[in-house]
């Protein structure tokens, strides 16, 4: 695995609402750890989008090749810069469903196009299918830094307002994952008559 450069990590995994100057394009990076249930690391890697192929699809291909032994259980932790798009969410759900010996957890730095219904549905589908999607906070950023960044033995230095941004994104994700029935009941409970 080629570790990420510090500047790439901070730019791409940064959870700020707006890109700080100098402006740059945010890309999708997916860093994962494949472990045995007792914690033994089998493999780790960092992937990114390739031409017309999302990082999640590259991830599925890699994991398929690494987990052919269906008698062995595997746990996978993913750190991703953007939450999966609806297509990738669907593919991840199908992949985990077809491979019950795998357990997948996703930590996203930011939510991708979270205001669009289709993207929200993708996140809900992951959640409903038993694939937890959570927002990265300081412990996840630190773990990602330790395991995937060429940090030259430097500790992770959080950018300003990292915690505040994480909490804001978590609230948004929580609202997306709240079942619509609960929202309807909450609306009825307002008794706006």
Swiss-Prot record:
It is an enzyme of class 3 (hydrolase). This is DNA dC->dU-editing enzyme APOBEC-3H. It catalyses: a 2'-deoxycytidine in single-stranded DNA + H2O + H(+) = a 2'-deoxyuridine in single-stranded DNA + NH4(+). The active site is at 56 (proton donor). Belongs to the cytidine and deoxycytidylate deaminase family. The keyword Cytoplasm applies. GO terms for cellular component: cytoplasm; nucleus; P-body. The keyword Nuclease does not apply. Expressed in peripheral blood mononuclear cells. Residues 24-126 form the CMP/dCMP-type deaminase domain. Its cofactor is Zn(2+). SUPFAM superfamilies: Cytidine deaminase-like (SSF53927). GO terms for molecular function: cytidine deaminase activity; RNA binding; zinc ion binding.
């Amino acid at each position: 695995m080629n570790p990420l450069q510090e500047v790439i990590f901070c730019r791409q995994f940064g959870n700020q609402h707006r890109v700080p100057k100098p402006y740059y394009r945010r890309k999708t990076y997916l860093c994962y750890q494949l472990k045995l249930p007792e914690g033994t690391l089998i493999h780790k890697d960092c992937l990114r989008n390739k031409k017309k192929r999302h990082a999640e699809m590259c991830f599925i291909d890699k994991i398929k090749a690494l987990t052919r032994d269906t008698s062995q259980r595997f746990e996978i932790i993913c750190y991703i810069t953007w939450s999966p798009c609806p297509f990738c969410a669907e593919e991840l759900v199908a992949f985990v469903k077809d491979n019950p010996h795998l357990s997948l957890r996703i930590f996203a730095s930011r939510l991708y196009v979270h205001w669009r219904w289709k993207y929200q549905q993708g996140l809900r589908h992951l959640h409903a299918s038993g694939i937890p999607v959570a927002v990265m906070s300081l412990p996840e950023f630190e773990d990602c830094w330790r395991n995937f960044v060429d940090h030259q033995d430097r500790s992770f230095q959080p950018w300003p307002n990292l915690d505040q941004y994480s909490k804001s994104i978590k609230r948004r994700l929580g609202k997306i994952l709240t079942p619509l029935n609960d929202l309807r009941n909450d609306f009825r409970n307002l008794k706006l008559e």
